[in-house]
Swiss-Prot record:
Residues 20-471 are lumenal. Residues 1-19 form the signal peptide. This is Calmegin. It comes from Homo sapiens (Human). Functions during spermatogenesis as a chaperone for a range of client proteins that are important for sperm adhesion onto the egg zona pellucida and for subsequent penetration of the zona pellucida. Required for normal sperm migration from the uterus into the oviduct. Required for normal male fertility. Binds calcium ions. The chain crosses the membrane at residues 472-492. InterPro entries: Calret/calnex, Calret/calnex_CS, Calreticulin/calnexin_P_dom_sf, ConA-like_dom_sf. Residues 258-338, 521-610 are annotated as: Disordered. The modification Phosphoserine is found at residues 560, 576, 579, 581, 591, 594, 601. Residues 493-610 are cytoplasmic.
Length: 610
């Protein structure tokens, strides 16, 4: 039972440690199981990585790797935000094309947001507008928060295909169709998927937000690794959001967005008004209740405690604070600019017991009853809470295919961040999942390969986890101590002292009645044994000789004369004991043979040869 308890305790400790490195809320499979596994060892990394700029294997609407080192086709915004001061309304954030700070892939570059606390806006035109019809929409790109993230976003906007779209004027109010990507402020971690649906009757665009993912997104913002974000919208009005090729959110455009696509069939009548006689009071004062005659409303809630007396030595005329007599006016004090100098106030040393006007403390008034109010009773005229009547919604419509959104023709990043060095790379917009997967294998795969190879060992991971959770050190010590205790208990068990009795008593044999024939047979056997004493003596000597030979083999040293004398004395005493026991048996036989009663005998115990 003790060992079972040890193993149970050890298992619980390991589970506690693993909980720090696992996301309990994630119900989807890990990336290693869903995506193409990449095995990397140090010998492979020692050779030169042959990175090639990804090339799409199928039709794409947009593809950008930034490996050329130039922002060809990208337009920096020159617009200003509305309703803000001119100094902070301009989009003056800086963009650069750089390699990753850590785990660089030779030859691979990305777009990096370089400024803190500034507005950034940059955009590019698609090769051709994407029209929502019978093909899926797949949007994919990479993000790396190289310095973590305090407050800011890394989402993209797909800009509506309109005649007035000018990329130099791209700002926060530019019409977009889809907004997708990570965003964080404080401890609120988000992965946006927002699309703007056009009302078929009014023509007004309304934002529809997909339900939030059911997984913990924190690690994607804090681990400083490059993560792959993918959005898939299908013509059957379903969607999927993937991170590192693992599904983290999916659902229906008809059911899993807020507010829903279809408006309610009925709405409250805006012209309906509550009648003046409508009574919403569930309880009313009892009209039959009368105030008791002895109810005194003039008594205060608290009165002075008359049992308390002013302490002796209380100084009524002394102030609590006095000017510091040791304070001096500074030499650089200018009364024209600083005003009249006054010494700082300090506690009055004379007020050790108390100073100022003394007042007794206040206590609750036992006679206080307060203002009398009649008790409440059920309102017999209660009509319930009034609500306007329902009327048919004049703007109601049915849209069974919300996938058919307005087309878009440009991709833009309009961001504000308190953290710099946000890395973007490998944008692609297409309609085939195989094209996007191949694009990721040629680009993002290399970053993950190198990051996994450079990942710290288990010891460093444990130490890093303990930096944020100091209590883990206790678990580490206990976890390490339990196996040591088990090994110690197995290898060096505690010796239990055995208690030996000085003497052991033998049980006497039970007296069994025997016949005369049996007794005569036993007498013959005893006489035969007495007639051949030499045989027994020779057998005994032979046994003693064998024992002496064994002792000589185990103990090569010769025995001393004293030891030989002791051994011979023991042999003589054993022989005398044996002869004495034989005489006693004869006497017992003779005594049992006489008498008129039934013949009984005590079973005799023969002496063992050793």
């Amino acid at each position: 039972m003790h060992f079972q308890a040890f193993w149970l305790c050890l298992g619980l400790l390991f589970i506690s440690i693993n909980a720090e490195f696992m996301d309990d809320d994630v119900e989807t499979e890990d990336f290693e199981e869903n995506s193409e596994e990449i095995d990397v060892n140090e010998s492979e990394l020692s050779s030169e990585i042959k990175y090639k700029t990804p090339q799409p294997i199928g039709e794409v609407y947009f593809a950008e790797t930034f490996d050329s080192g130039r922002l060809a086709g990208w337009v920096l915004s020159k617009a200003k935000k509305d309703d803000m001061d001119e100094e902070i309304s301009i989009y003056d954030g800086r963009w650069e094309i750089e390699e990753l700070k850590e785990n660089q892939v030779p030859g691979d570059r990305g777009l990096v947001l370089k400024s803190r606390a500034k507005h950034h806006a940059i955009s590019a035109v698609l090769a051709k507008p994407f029209i929502f019809a019978d093909k899926p929409l797949i949007v994919q790109y990479e993000v790396n928060f190289q310095d973590g993230i305090d407050c800011g976003g890394a989402y993209i906007k797909l800009l509506a295909d309109t005649d007035d779209l000018i990329l130099e004027n791209f700002y926060d109010k530019t019409s977009y169709i889809i907004m997708f990507g990570p965003d964080k402020c404080g401890e609120d971690y988000k992965l946006h998927f927002i699309f703007r649906h056009k009302h078929p009757k009014t023509g007004v665009f309304e934002e529809k937000h997909a339900k939030p993912p059911d997984v913990d997104l924190k690690k994607f913002f804090t681990d400083r690794k490059t993560h792959l974000y993918t959005l898939v919208m299908n013509p059957d009005d379903t969607f999927e959001v993937l991170v590192d090729q693992t599904v983290v959110n999916k659902g229906s455009l008809l059911e899993d967005v807020v507010p829903p696509i279809k408006p309610p069939k009925e709405i409250e009548d805006p012209n309906d008004k509550k009648p003046e006689e409508w009574d919403e009071r569930a309880k009313i004062p009892d009209p039959s209740a009368v105030k008791p005659e002895d109810w005194d409303e003039s008594e205060p809630a608290q009165i002075e405690d008359s049992s308390v007396v002013k302490p002796a030595g209380w100084l009524d005329d002394e102030p609590k604070f006095i000017p510091d007599p040791n304070a001096e006016k500074p030499d650089d004090w200018n009364e024209d600019t600083d005003g009249e100098w006054e010494a700082p106030q300090i506690l009055n040393p004379a007020c050790r017991i108390g100073c100022g006007e003394w007042k007794p403390p206040m206590i609750d008034n036992p006679k206080y009853k307060g203002v009398w109010r009649p008790p409440l009773v059920d309102n017999p005229n209660y009509q319930g809470i009034w609500s306007p009547r329902k009327i048919p919604n004049p703007d109601y419509f049915e849209d069974d295919h919300p996938f058919l959104l307005t087309s878009f023709s440009a991709l833009g990043l309009e961001l504000w961040s308190m953290t710099s060095d946000i890395y973007f790379d490998n944008f692609i917009i297409c309609s085939e999942k195989e094209v996007a997967d191949h694009w990721a294998a040629d680009g993002w795969r290399w970053k993950i390969m190198i990051a996994n190879a450079n990942k710290p060992g288990v010891l460093k991971q444990l130490m890093a986890a303990a930096e944020g959770h100091p209590w883990l050190w206790l678990i580490y010590l206990v976890t390490a101590g339990v196996p040591i205790a088990l090994i110690t208990s197995f290898c060096w068990p505690r010796k239990v002292k055995k208690k030996h009795k000085d003497t052991e008593y033998k049980k006497t044999d039970i007296c069994i009645p025997q016949t005369k024939g049996v007794l005569e047979q036993e007498e013959k056997e005893e006489k035969a044994a007495l007639e051949k004493p030499m045989d027994l003596e020779e057998e005994k000597k032979q046994n003693d000789g064998e024992m002496l030979e064994k002792e000589e083999e185990s103990e090569p040293e010769e025995k001393s004369e004293e030891e030989i004398e002791i051994i011979e004395g023991q042999e003589e005493s054993n022989q005398s004991n044996k002869s004495g026991s034989e005489d006693e048996m004869k006497e017992a036989d003779e005594s049992t043979g006489s008498g008129d009663g039934p013949i009984k005998s005590v079973r005799k115990r023969r002496v063992r040869k050793d």
